[in-house]
Amino acid sequence: MAYGGILNDADITAALEACXAXDSFNAKSFFAKVGLSAKTPDDIKKAFAVIDQDKSGFIEEDELKLFLQNFSAGARALTDAETKAFLKAGDSDGDGKIGVDEFAALVKA
């Protein structure tokens, strides 16, 4: 798993189960449940690198939609509403994508 050494598998499973229903995803509670909120800035940057699939230095809307699948291949895609809410919560400079510093701020929020 891409998060080996950063996150605990049991925490990942619990966090994914908590948002298994469509439109139940909340970034802040997910980051807390999965244990990312308590991690070091370095570990948060490593997590960002996993989510940034195209290695552009940003997490774009299409990568956010598939966010949960970074934690488990069988996880659902986020709904359009969840994706837009996630982007709005993390995109503090309004450029339509989430940079590493914005991601770290969202995780720690």
From Swiss-Prot:
Residues 39-74, 78-109 form the EF-hand domain. GO terms for cellular component: cytoplasm. In muscle, parvalbumin is thought to be involved in relaxation after contraction. It binds two calcium ions. Transmembrane segments: none annotated. This parvalbumin has an isoelectric point of 4.47. The keyword Repeat applies. This is Parvalbumin alpha. Ca(2+) 2 binds at D91, D93, D95, K97, E102. The keyword Mitochondrion does not apply. Keywords: Acetylation, Calcium, Metal-binding, Muscle protein, Repeat. SMART domains: EFh. Belongs to the parvalbumin family. Pfam families: EF-hand_7. It comes from Cyprinus carpio (Common carp). Ca(2+) 1 binds at D52, D54, S56, F58, E60, E63. GO terms for molecular function: calcium ion binding. The modification N-acetylalanine is found at A2.
